[in-house]
Regions:
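Short catalytic/metal-binding and nucleic-acid-binding patches
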Residues: 1-332
Length: 332
C-alpha cells in the first residue's frame, strides 16, 4: 500500500524533492499529438510560467524543471528559513495572490483597523497559510489545478487531467544527499535529449538547463562568476562552512556535467567514456558507468527516495518505516 504524502515528504530528513505529474486521457500536455495532429506546444509556456511564478510565492524554490509532451518534472527545495522569517502580513499577502482569502484577512491586508477578536482570527489564519507556503503538496495542487482548468477549457471537456497518483496527481521522490541531488538535476535537465526532442542542453526549450545557460551567456567578460537566473535556486559552490542556501555545486561544474552526459547519451557512446571526468563526478566519487545508468533510469532505480544506502536508512528510521526500501547500487 502506498505511503501517504506526509510519510514521503519530511523537511527534517531532506529539503529536496523530485516531483512528476503525468496526463490522462491519452491527451498530450504539450507538443504535437501524433494521433490528432493537433499542436499543444503553447501549453509548455503555461506550465513553465506557472512553475516559476509559484516559486516566487511559496517558500519553495525551484531547482530544476523540464516540460515534456505528456508530463513534467520539477525539483523543489523547501526553504524553511524563509518560511519562518516571513511576517504574518507577508504570509497573508502571498497567499492572497493565489486565493481570495476571507473578509477579515482582506481588511487586515488593506490596513483597516481590526478588533482584538479579528486580530486573533488573522493570526490563526496566518499560521495555517504559513504552513501551506512550505508544503509541496499545496505547491503541486495549485500548479496542477491551474493547468488542468486551462487545458480542459481549451479541450472543451471536463474530468481529470492528471494521473491520480496518491493525492494531488503527482509522484514524489526524496533526494537524500548530494549524489542523489546531482543525479536527479541532470536526469530532469536532460529529459529532452533522452527523448530526442533536443540536441543539446541549450536547445532544450522549457527546461531549467536552458535558463541556466541563457543567463550564463549574459555574463560580462570581467565578472568573477557566471550570471544565474534569480527565479531558480542558485548554485553556491562546493560544501563549506557557513554556506548560504543554494545548490551545493559550482554552476560551471554542473554545466560541464550536463554537456558531458548529454553528448554520451545523444550519441550512445557508453562504451567510450572520456577519461577527463567532470569535477562533480570526481568529488562525489560516482563511477561514470553507474552515473549514466542513473541519469537514464532515475525514476526506475529509485521509488519514493533516492540516495546512498546510509542516507536511505537514516530517513527510514526518521520516518518510522518498518523496512528499508530496495536501493539502487548506483548511489551506494
Amino acid at each position: 500500500m502506498p505511503k501517504p504524502r506526509k510519510c514521503q515528504i519530511a523537511v527534517d530528513a531532506t529539503p529536496y524533492y523530485h516531483c512528476v505529474s503525468r496526463c490522462v486521457r491519452r491527451a498530450f500536455l504539450c507538443g504535437l499529438d501524433p494521433y490528432t495532429q493537433v499542436s499543444y506546444e503553447h501549453r509548455r509556456g503555461w506550465v513553465e510560467q506557472k512553475i516559476l511564478a509559484l516559486g516566487q510565492v511559496f517558500c519553495i524554490d525551484v531547482c530544476a524543471y523540464a516540460v515534456m509532451s505528456n508530463h513534467y518534472h520539477v525539483v523543489l527545495f523547501i526553504n524553511s528559513s524563509e518560511q519562518a522569517q516571513l511576517t504574518d502580513f507577508e504570509v497573508l499577502e502571498r497567499w492572497s495572490q493565489l486565493f481570495r482569502g476571507n473578509l477579515i484577512v482582506n481588511r487586515y491586508v488593506r490596513g483597516d483597523d481590526l478588533c482584538e477578536a479579528e486580530l486573533y482570527v488573522v493570526n490563526q489564519v496566518a499560521e495555517l497559510w504559513r504552513e501551506r507556503l512550505g508544503n509541496i503538496s499545496w505547491f503541486m495542487k495549485v500548479l496542477n489545478e491551474h493547468i488542468a482548468r486551462e487545458a480542459n477549457r481549451e479541450d472543451v471537456c471536463t474530468g481529470k487531467f492528471w494521473e491520480p497518483d496518491a493525492d494531488q496527481g503527482f509522484k514524489s521522490q526524496a533526494l537524500l544527499d548530494d549524489k542523489a541531488l546531482a543525479a536527479c538535476l541532470a536526469y530532469v535537465d536532460l529529459n529532452p535529449i533522452r527523448a530526442k526532442m533536443a540536441e543539446s542542453p541549450e536547445t532544450s526549450e522549457h527546461t531549467s538547463a536552458k535558463k541556466w545557460i541563457d543567463a550564463a551567456k549574459r555574463t560580462k567578460s570581467n565578472a568573477l562568476s557566471l550570471n544565474q537566473p534569480n527565479i531558480l535556486l542558485p548554485f553556491i559552490g562546493n560544501p563549506r562552512e557557513s554556506m548560504p542556501i543554494g545548490l551545493p555545486f559550482k554552476l560551471t561544474d554542473y554545466l560541464d556535467l550536463l554537456y558531458w552526459t548529454g553528448c554520451i547519451l545523444r550519441h550512445d557512446k557508453r562504451g567510450a567514456i572520456d577519461e577527463s571526468l567532470p569535477p562533480i563526478l570526481k568529488r562525489l566519487k560516482i563511477e561514470p558507468k553507474n552515473w549514466l545508468q542513473n541519469v537514464k533510469y532515475f525514476e526506475t532505480n529509485f521509488k519514493v527516495m533516492a540516495g546512498s544506502l546510509s542516507s536511505v536508512k537514516f530517513k527510514c528510521t526518521h520516518l518510522g518505516y518498518q523496512r528499508v526500501p530496495a536501493t539502487s547500487p548506483i548511489l551506494t
